[in-house]
């Protein structure tokens, strides 16, 4: 996977060919035309999808939802216009193939996910689809045939648990079918049913096709953070490891409900105070971890008092979520 600085359409549109198809550019002596053509096309592609899936300040494309499906169908339409071979796997992932000279060789795959987080960034996932599509489009226009099959992949439901890729590998677990992205979301099993997907093959442990048929999978991705974007020199990063994620979706801190003006401090059992102190302690541990040279993150994404809470009532409980991420599994688990 490559990570690109956010909001840089030129990098998104051109990095794939510059880094992985440089030989083709040298042979064609047409790199300037490629950059100009792909940058303009990618900008239009991003805007087209943004309009389809706009949600407040960002975009929302939930896994196996209608907006994600619109992205997949838009990509399929583009692939058909380019004359690419179109197919879907058992998890609903889309594959668009530009045939190579030797079709007996394992294929090069490149792509990313069509979904997003709620009110997320438009380039998340979409950049990794735009880049190989731009490369395929350019090769079709210039009548360039790659040495082996080149396949653009559009994955489903990555943000909810990488279920597009997991389904391809046959590694979905039975308990996953009852998982929800949010408390109000349908379960994964219900989402599968809504798209006519049979979950049984996705839990078989057998990949949808032999992995030996894949020579490489290349994913370009925006950084989703400020490090590369704030650097004058470092604009492209190579991923050296994938973080493990430990999620506590609901932690409950119990207290005692009471009137705000009637209970002095020594007699209070305030869950908001206790939860805040606990989060503050996590913050101190995080700082100490970073100072020791180790890398991890934690995030409290949700913190709520009960629906019938009021400004003048000490609540009886607080619920919160914690997301802990680290490359070192033992470090991650020590926080969990």
Question: PLM ranges: what are they?
Answer:
Residues 14-15:
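Intrinsic, low-complexity polybasic segments
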Residues 21-59, 99, 314:
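N-terminal hydrophobic or amphipathic helices/low-complexity stretches enriched
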Residues 51-99:
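A non-catalytic alpha/beta surface segment that caps or lines the substrate-entry region
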Residues 78, 82, 94-127, 132, ...:
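Catalytic-core environment of secreted peptidases
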Residues 115, 161, 166, 170-329:
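Midchain, well-structured core segments that form catalytic/ion-binding scaffolds
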Residues 133-141, 277-284:
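Short glycine/serine- and small hydrophobic-enriched flexible loop segments
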Residues 139-160, 291-301:
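Short helix-loop-beta-strand segments that form the rim/entrance of peptidase-like active sites
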Residues 329-335:
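Short, conserved charged micro-motifs
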């Amino acid at each position: 996977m490559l990570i690109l600085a956010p909001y840089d359409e030129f990098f998104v549109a051109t990095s794939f060919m510059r880094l992985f198809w440089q030989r083709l550019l040298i042979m064609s002596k047409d790199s300037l035309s490629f950059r100009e053509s792909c940058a303009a096309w990618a900008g239009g592609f991003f805007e087209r999808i943004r309009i389809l899936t706009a949600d407040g300040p960002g975009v929302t494309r939930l896994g196996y939802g209608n907006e994600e499906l619109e992205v997949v169908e838009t990509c399929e339409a583009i692939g058909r216009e380019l004359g690419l071979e179109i197919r879907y796997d058992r998890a609903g992932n889309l594959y668009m193939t530009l045939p190579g000279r030797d079709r007996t060789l394992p294929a090069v795959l490149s792509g990313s996910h069509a979904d997003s987080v709620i009110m997320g960034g438009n380039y998340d996932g979409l950049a990794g689809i735009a880049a190989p599509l731009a490369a395929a489009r350019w090769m079709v226009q210039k009548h360039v045939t790659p040495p082996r099959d080149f396949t653009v992949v559009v994955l489903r439901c990555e943000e909810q648990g990488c279920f597009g890729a997991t389904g391809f590998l046959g590694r979905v677990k039975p308990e996953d079918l009852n998982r929800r992205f949010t408390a109000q979301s349908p379960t994964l099993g219900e989402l599968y049913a809504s798209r006519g997907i049979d979950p049984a093959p996705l839990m078989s442990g057998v990949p949808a096709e032999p992995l030996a048929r894949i020579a490489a999978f290349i994913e370009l991705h925006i950084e989703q953070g400020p490090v590369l974007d704030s650097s004058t020199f470092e604009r492209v990063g190579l991923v050296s490891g994938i973080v493990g994620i430990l999620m506590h979706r609901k932690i409950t801190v119990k207290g005692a409900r009471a009137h705000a003006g009637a209970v002095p401090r020594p007699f209070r059992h305030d869950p908001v105070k206790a939860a805040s102190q606990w989060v503050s302690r996590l913050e101190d541990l995080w700082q100490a971890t970073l100072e020791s040279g180790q890398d991890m993150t934690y995030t409290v994404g949700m913190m709520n008092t009960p629906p019938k809470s009021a400004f003048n009532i000490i609540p009886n409980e607080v619920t919160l979520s914690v997301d802990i991420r680290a490359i070192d599994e033992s470090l991650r688990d020590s926080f969990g």
